[in-house]
C-alpha cells in the first residue's frame, strides 16, 4: 500500500471517496417534482397534453364586426385594415406561443372546455386512428372471428361422421345392403330401422352366433366397421282364424322356429375333414401330391378360423 499510512486508513479513504461519488451522481440525476413554478405553469393540473396544444394552436379571436353603416362610409379603410390586422394577429400569436409562457398556460386552460364539448368526437377519431395504424391486427381479428363459426360447423359435421360406421347385411341370395349404424345401437334398433314390421322374422347371424338378444349393443358383440352380418328371414306364419278348429290346429303345428343352420356348419365341416383325412391315410394311392397339399392348407385355414371365432 502507501508508505507511512496503515492499511486501515487507505481502505477508509477509498470507501469515503466511493460514497461521495455515488452521492454526487444521485444528486445530479435528482429532479424535484412540483418545485419549479415554470414547470407548473407549463403543465396544467388537469388534462396534460402540451404537444396537442402546441401542434394545434388556438386561433386569435376575431375582432367584432363593425356596423354596416361604418363599413359603407369607409370602404377603403375596411379593405386595408383586415389584412394588416390579420398579419399582426398571426405574428402576435406566434410570438406568444414561442416566448410568452403565461399565454401558453392560459390557452392550455382555455382549450379543455372545447375538448369536453367534443370529447366524444375526439375519442371516435382516436379509435379510428388506432385502427388505421394497425390494419394487420384488425384483419387478423376479422379472420379469427370468421374462422370460429366455420370451425364449429366443421366439428359438428365431423362428430356424427366419426360416430357412424358401416355394417354389411348379407342375405342368403348373396345380396348385400349397407347399414349406417352407431356402436351404441342395439340389435332391436338395427332390425326396426332396416326391417320395419319384420323384426320377429329376421334372424341376424354374426360369426356363427345367432343374435337373439335385442337389447345387446353392437359394441358389446365386437361388431366393428365394415363387418358382415348374415340375415335370414324365417317363413313362420301366424295362425289365421278359420271356421274349423282342425285347420287352426294344423296351422299351429307348422309354425315354429327354423333350426340354427349357422351353428351346424362347423360340426359338419369338421366331420367332412375327418373323413377326407381317413381316406388319405388308408388309401394313399388315390391322393396325389397337389391334393395332399391342398388338404393340408384347407385344414390349417379351418383351424385358424375356428380358433378365431371361439377364442374371443
Curated annotation (Swiss-Prot):
GO terms for cellular component: cytoplasm; membrane; nucleus. This is Transmembrane and ubiquitin-like domain-containing protein 1. InterPro entries: TMUB1/2, Ubiquitin-like_dom, Ubiquitin-like_domsf. It comes from the Eukaryota. Pfam families: ubiquitin (PF00240). GO terms for biological process: ERAD pathway. Residues 140-161 have a biased composition (Basic and acidic residues).
Amino acid at each position: 500500500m502507501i508508505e507511512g499510512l496503515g492499511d486501515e486508513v487507505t481502505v477508509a479513504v477509498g470507501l469515503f471517496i466511493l460514497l461521495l461519488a455515488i452521492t454526487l451522481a444521485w444528486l445530479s440525476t435528482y429532479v424535484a417534482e412540483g418545485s419549479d413554478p415554470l414547470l407548473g405553469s407549463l403543465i396544467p393540473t388537469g388534462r396534460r397534453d402540451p404537444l396537442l396544444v402546441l401542434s394545434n394552436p388556438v386561433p386569435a379571436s376575431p375582432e367584432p364586426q363593425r356596423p354596416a353603416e361604418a363599413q359603407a362610409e369607409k370602404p377603403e379603410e375596411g379593405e386595408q385594415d383586415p389584412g394588416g390586422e390579420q398579419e399582426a394577429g398571426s405574428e402576435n400569436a406566434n410570438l406568444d406561443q414561442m416566448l410568452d409562457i403565461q399565454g401558453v398556460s392560459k390557452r392550455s386552460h382555455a382549450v379543455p372546455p372545447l375538448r369536453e364539448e367534443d370529447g366524444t368526437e375526439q375519442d371516435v377519431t382516436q379509435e379510428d386512428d388506432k385502427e388505421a395504424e394497425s390494419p394487420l391486427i384488425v384483419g387478423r381479428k376479422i379472420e379469427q372471428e370468421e374462422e370460429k363459426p366455420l370451425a364449429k360447423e366443421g366439428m359438428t359435421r365431423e362428430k356424427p361422421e366419426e360416430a357412424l360406421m358401416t355394417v354389411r347385411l348379407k342375405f342368403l341370395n348373396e345380396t348385400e345392403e349397407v347399414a349406417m349404424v352407431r356402436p351404441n345401437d342395439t340389435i332391436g334398433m338395427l332390425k326396426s330401422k332396416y326391417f320395419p314390421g319384420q323384426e320377429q322374422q329376421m334372424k341376424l347371424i354374426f360369426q356363427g352366433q345367432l343374435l337373439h338378444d335385442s337389447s345387446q349393443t353392437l359394441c358389446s358383440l365386437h361388431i366393428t366397421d365394415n363387418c358382415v352380418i348374415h340375415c335370414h328371414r324365417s317363413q313362420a306364419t301366424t295362425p289365421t282364424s278359420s271356421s274349423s278348429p282342425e285347420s287352426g290346429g294344423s296351422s299351429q303345428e307348422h309354425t315354429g322356429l327354423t333350426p340354427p343352420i349357422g351353428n351346424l356348419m362347423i360340426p359338419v365341416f369338421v366331420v367332412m375333414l375327418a373323413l377326407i383325412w381317413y381316406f388319405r391315410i388308408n388309401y394313399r394311392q388315390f391322393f396325389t401330391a397337389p391334393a395332399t397339399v391342398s388338404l393340408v392348407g384347407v385344414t390349417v385355414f379351418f383351424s385358424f378360423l375356428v380358433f378365431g371365432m371361439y377364442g374371443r
